Amino acid sequence: MAKILITESVHPIGPELLTAAGHTVVYADRDMDVIRREIVDADAVLVRIIELPDSLLATAKNLKIVSKHGVGYDNIDLDYCKSHGVAVTITPNANSLSVAEHAFTLMLTLAKNIIPVSDEYREIGFAAKNHAPGIEMTGKTLGLIGMGRIGKHVLHMCKDGMDMHVIVYDPYISEVPEGVEKVDDLSELLRRADIVTLHCLLTDETRKLIDRERLALMKPTALLINCARGPIVDEAALIEALENGRLAGAGLDVTDPEPVAPDSPLFKLPNVIVTPHYAPTTVESATRVSKIAAENINAVLAGQEPVGRIV
């Protein structure tokens, strides 16, 4: 029997699978005091977005696996895990469709001015009909940065569903689907795209990938969507561009820092939609991710090979 620490809330199917396998499950509910206390003798950690630095992992003397609830693993110290024989797994494909749908929804909601018009209707009545018109997405150019699992779903929705021209920037791929354009110069994508959407991992290379200089390349009518990781965008530069009319709007499911400060300008700008890292949060996705994350723990503790192993 092993001890499993779950740092944040997950769909109950995962903990049920762990308990059925004979393990003891401890819930921390994002309480860092509980996490620091319980990780000391934990055999496994199931984590969502709580940071697991080497200083914390080093206290976990029995740790055999860190099972990530999701696919982004920038909150886990991989170097420590590699050097100490701790397995690290992700849940590939489990939430990619939900995240892609969220990104697509942000695009449409911004393009059609849904939120400001709805708010105005409540405040001033039918005169809200005179709000500045939205735009059609059909026929526009999408700039897709990162064509992994999520990016491929977004590509399909925009190209096949909305007849958009899609430009892809991803230095790690060699081929793109027929009818899609691949560019090797990110600046070219930013200059040409009507909507730029980010679907890349957070690495040293992608941190502040979208900085002040690159934001300045974008059309003033363009929209920026980020459902990847907050630090990929220089948030101060983004706010400045939005406030000064150099960018038409932004849809952000992730921010830097996270959560957003209550007094952040992002909450005050009418051309910004901010959601609380909510893109993966669907009934279907939550079920799949929790199940796979738990199955990975059970597999490693049973001496079997898990899915989505990165360490």
Explain the meaning of each model-derived region:
Residues 50-57, 167, 171-265:
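Rossmann-like adenosine-cofactor binding region
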Residues 84-86, 92-141, 145, 153-157, ...:
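Phosphate-binding beta-alpha-beta segment of Rossmann-like dinucleotide-binding domains, i.e.
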Residues 43-44, 65, 195, 223, ...:
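Short, Asp-centered acidic motifs that coordinate Mg2+ and/or phosphate
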Residues 150:
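Hydrophobic/small residue at the entry helix of a nucleotide-binding pocket
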Residues 28, 145, 169:
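The conserved SAM/SAH-binding core of class I Rossmann-like methyltransferase domains
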Residues 82, 89-101, 116, 258-311:
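C-terminal helix-to-coil terminal segments
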